[in-house]
Amino acid sequence: MDPKRRALLAAGAAVAAATAVPRVFAGQPAARGTGKFFEKGPVRIYYEEAGSGFPLLLLPGGGLNATIGFFTGNPPFNAIEEFKGEYRCITADLRNAPAGQSTGPVEVDRPWESYADDQLGLMDHLGIDKFMVMGFCLGGPFIWSLLKRAPNRIAGAVLAQPVGWRPEMRDPGYAGAFWKGWPAQISAKRPEVSKQTAEQFVIKMFETDADFVFTVTRDFVRVCQNPILVLPDEVPAHPYAVAMECAMLAPRAEVSVFPWKEPKERIPLAVRQIHSFLRAHRPV
């Protein structure tokens, strides 16, 4: 990484730290938005909206069991409550999340693409062209997929505790291989989806030519001109090294202080930086 770029990234985090002020967080339960369904062919996506302003698509964490409930469960902060005062927040249950209400085909040959279909299809359904996006966990690879497929529609992207590939994930017993339990869960909920089909889906998604952020190459990240903000993590499924590599490679990337979740007093700093980033890049 260019020494000047490393210094700029460090300076950005330092400025955010210096200007941070305490905030009230939505760690406690909050009122949910109004839920609706978006349907396209055999796909049925449950989504909710809250607030008004420039559209902000919020992708919940939770791996393949990502649902809107993530935001009122035990996240670092409740992004819906935090941003609905300035943005039209839109979020949805992931297709075929066992605990969610979204359903659709298990597309073995195009797993990542099928999720991008849902995310962009929901924006189309709502009549939204340009939007910003913030994703937790598996939302990181989803965002890179969206940036590759529809770069002109995304004004800015925030990747919080993003998923990334590490060689240890080849070990079936590794804690970071979060997708291993999904086939049994989804086939139990939907008997028409065989466990074999579900296993083929996750193998294609996470184990076939797996590398980096799963959905794009390093060469793509090097030329991506969309503004991004990375909030790294360091747990088995969220490798710090991959998150930082994205921040170093992407020409218009910023990065938060790390660690930003511990001690808890640092979370307001991270949220303040997200607010500043979104305001800086949303269209006037």
Predicted features along the sequence, with ranges:
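Conserved acidic catalytic loop of the alpha/beta-hydrolase fold
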Residues: S114-K130
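Conserved HGGG/HGGXW glycine-rich cap/lid loop of the alpha/beta-hydrolase fold
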Residues: V43-Q101
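N-terminal secretory signal peptides
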Residues: M1-P3
